[in-house]
Amino acid sequence: MATEISARGRPRAIGQEEYNLYSSLSEDELVQMAIEQSLADKTRGPTTTETTVPTRVNREPAHFYPWTRSSVSPESALTSAPKGLFQEVMQKYNRSKSSQLAPVDPVLKAIKEDDEEALTAMIKAGKNLSEPNKEGWLPLHEAAYYGQLNCLKALHRAYPAVIDQRTLQEETALYLATCRGHVDCLQFLLQAGAEPDISNKSRETPLYKACERKNVEAVRILVQYKADTNHRCNRGWTALHESVARNDLEVMEILVSGGAKVEAKNAYGITPLFVAAQSGQLEALRFLAKYGADINTQASDSASALYEACKNGHEEVVEFLLSQGADANKTNKDGMLPLHIASKKGNYRIVQMLLPVTSRTRVRRSGISPLHLAAERNNDEVLEALLGARFDVNAPLAPERARLYEDRRSSALYFAVVNNNVYATELLLLAGADPNRDVINPLLVAIRHGCLRTMQLLLDHGANIDAYIATHPTAFPATIMFAMKCLSLLKFLMDLGCNGEPCFSCLYGNGPHPPAPPPSNRFNDAPASDKAPSAVQFCEFLSAPEVSRWAGPIIDVLLDYVGNVQLCSRLKEHIDSFEDWAVIKEKAEPPRPLAHLCRLRVRKAIGKYRIKLLDTLPLPGRLIRYLKYENTQ
């Protein structure tokens, strides 16, 4: 094999001739050339290397005798960095030198070539083949690993006492033969008296490995020789667990006939039936149910087989379990039912199967509705199914579950609004969801998102347009606070009846105001526990650096929706800070125009919840438009 090198655009091939040219040099001369080549490469920059290599790298097995591999680097190792001509030659030289020094073990060579005569001759010559190498491997282990039956027999005849001797990984010859699928070697060892239940360091027996490899013949032979079908590995898994995970019915039949317990549990309380349900192995599930396995088995965390099948979306398994009487009202340690997890995963068909058999009382006790989970994951189809089944659309999250969310959300509607899911929001509102139940009103979330469609839906269904945040009190509606950075949005809310009067009811009036608070985000900071938080004044919030530059236009918009008000000294400071805002100060001077005051009086009489009905009043169109602020002249 030749390696193509492209240096400065000149392709070259390193062949046997160039190798011979360099191989005559001494090591000191080669080192000197390496230094010079490295300096030259740095001077002229990188080169482009294209290496032709085989698609698969042939490596010796991990158990290979260490004294025959420790000094040998892999022949076909790939190099990631480009190499110059000299590096390639040096690599070939070093490999050749190493291979010349590597010892060839005659015993291993004889075993790999199945040379029984050579092996027997060595034994007769007095060579001790019962001494392990530093990994604990005997020639017997090698013969079992490579499946060389004749060599195995010869070694056993010479050293019968080592038949069950283990490597440093606690592997016997029987274990190695099973792992490699050498059934003839396995059978010979068992006939010769090998113990079938000796496990490796992971407590995995030959029978366990045979099930893992789906080797039916090996399983049958091991069971015939009384291998323990209920032995547990360090995870508590039995051979039956392993065969169920692979849906190997033939092996399962052999194991159960050989005494395997269908209710054996691993370290996490998981039975073979639980494994079948979890991994969606329907045939294995049917087999275990036929042999009396508990359909309602639960793991250590109380999750049932049905719960796991729902979580992993195994529809046919869920259908079979329910047909066998599986209890759909068993909760896991978190109080979650199969319906909860199916709603969370968005599996419509499984939800439809669970709805008729799920207790509404158990759902209420859980402290969370499937509606919450469907809305949280935007599973609209499942949400429709749950609403069609008349689940309580206003069911709140239990306090301990609400505390898991920073905003202390409670309703399914809140989840839909947070996700900006207009369709789910509409579904929930049409089903009767109350938009005013959460600590933070969903309308405020919609304002933060800037979604007019969601805002309109919430307001049409009774959302409080003057919503406040109880945990962060303000002297003016939080809806105004959230909309300040978008004047068109602020006007939209004011048109729909938001109350702007509190913005001009300052505690300090024309008197001096206290210093502005430090520039920390007080609306994200938790209030001090030793005193109740004070309400934030409008002028205080308007003084925040990110808002103050819009102070004039914000005040201008709000003045269109209030009567005779008094600007406090701080608001006047903001207006005076920019000469073009002087007209706003004049606009605020009382008395306000009579037409404007009449408009406010009419709108107040109608009320904020009926303001959308202005078009139905028996008034001229021009007056209607004036009342709706469509004509501000």
UniProtKB/Swiss-Prot annotation:
Q: Which compartments does it reside in? A: Cytoplasm, Cytoskeleton, Stress fiber; Cytoplasm, Myofibril, Sarcomere, Z line
Q: Which UniProt keywords apply?
A: ANK repeat, Cytoplasm, Cytoskeleton, Phosphoprotein, Repeat, Ubl conjugation, Ubl conjugation pathway
Q: Where are the ANK repeats?
A: 102-131, 135-165, 169-198, 202-231, 235-264, 268-297, 301-330, 334-363, 366-395, 408-437, 438-467, 474-502
CDD domains reported in the protein's UniProt record: SOCS_ASB2
Q: Please give one Pfam family short name.
A: SOCS_box
Q: In which pathway does it act?
A: Protein modification; protein ubiquitination
Which residue intervals define the domain SOCS box in the entry? 579-633
Quaternary state and interactors = Component of a probable ECS E3 ubiquitin-protein ligase complex which contains CUL5, either RBX1 or RNF7/RBX2, Elongin BC complex (ELOB and ELOC) and ASB2. Interacts with SKP2. Through its interaction with SKP2, likely to bridge the formation of dimeric E3-ubiquitin-protein ligase complexes composed of an ECS complex and an SCF(SKP2) complex. Interacts with JAK2; the interaction targets JAK2 for Notch-mediated proteasomal degradation. Interacts with TCF3/E2A; the interaction is mediated by SKP2 and targets TCF3 for Notch-mediated proteasomal degradation. Interacts with DES.
Task: Give the function comment from the record.
Answer: Substrate-recognition component of a SCF-like ECS (Elongin-Cullin-SOCS-box protein) E3 ubiquitin-protein ligase complex which mediates the ubiquitination and subsequent proteasomal degradation of target proteins. Mediates Notch-induced ubiquitination and degradation of substrates including E2A and JAK2. Required during embryonic heart development for complete heart looping. Required for cardiomyocyte differentiation. Involved in myogenic differentiation and targets filamin FLNB for proteasomal degradation but not filamin FLNA. Also targets DES for proteasomal degradation.
Give the protein's recorded name.
Ankyrin repeat and SOCS box protein 2
According to its UniProt entry, this protein's organism is: Bos taurus (Bovine)
